[in-house]
Every structure is written in structure tokens, then in C-alpha cells.
Swiss-Prot record:
Secretion signal span: none
One Pfam family in the UniProt entry: Urease_gamma
Assembly description: Heterotrimer of UreA (gamma), UreB (beta) and UreC (alpha) subunits. Three heterotrimers associate to form the active enzyme.
Keywords linked to the UniProt accession: Cytoplasm, Hydrolase
Enzymatic class: hydrolase
Superkingdom of origin organism: Bacteria
Protein name: Urease subunit gamma
């Protein structure tokens, strides 16, 4: 199977998000890469499901709370930008202050 660099990035992001979901389910606080991966993967899945950019920008702030991440992580993540594939093409989704 041949994967493009973009497909490899998506697969790596999915794997990191899956790990983050498992750790969160165990009650563990997420670190920076896990938090960003989880938010990014949720946005990409929402785009694939046909949700709008505006919906995803809003939903992106509801995925994680400060209690879900290690100390200082929420202050480090000012925005998350994801290039997601929508039914009508690829668009950039930016979520400002995603961890509240």
C-alpha cells in the first residue's frame, strides 16, 4: 500500500488521538501533543461527516477542558489549525483558545 505524505500525517494524527482518547478515558491528564492530536482528529472527523467550518470552530472549544490536561497545557495551546477534507474540498479550520 502506497501512502502519500498527507495520508501518513493523517494516520499518525489518528494514532496519537486514539492514544489520547484512551488516556483520557482512564482519567489521565493529557500532555500538549495528545491534546492537540485529539482536538485535530475530532475536527477532521467532523469535516468528513459534513459539518461546516463554523460548526467545527465552535465544537473545537468543547472537546477538552482545563481539567482534562496537565498543568500549563491550556495556556500553551492558543489555537489549533487543521486542514480538513470536507465534501466540497479541503479547508483550513482554526479553533482559537480550544481548551477552556
Amino acid at each position: 500500500m502506497e501512502l502519500t505524505p498527507r495520508d501518513k500525517d493523517k494516520l499518525l494524527l489518528f494514532t496519537a488521538a486514539l492514544l489520547a482518547e484512551r488516556r483520557k478515558a482512564k482519567g489521565l491528564k493529557l500532555n500538549y501533543p495528545e491534546a492537540v492530536a485529539l482536538i485535530s482528529a475530532e475536527i477532521m472527523e467532523g469535516a468528513r461527516e459534513g459539518r461546516t467550518v463554523a460548526e467545527l470552530m465552535s465544537a473545537g472549544t468543547e472537546i477538552l477542558a482545563r481539567e482534562d490536561v496537565m498543568d500549563g497545557v491550556a495556556d500553551m495551546v492558543h489555537e489549533v489549525q487543521v486542514e480538513a477534507t470536507f465534501p466540497d474540498g479541503t479547508k483550513l479550520v482554526t479553533v482559537h483558545n480550544p481548551i477552556v
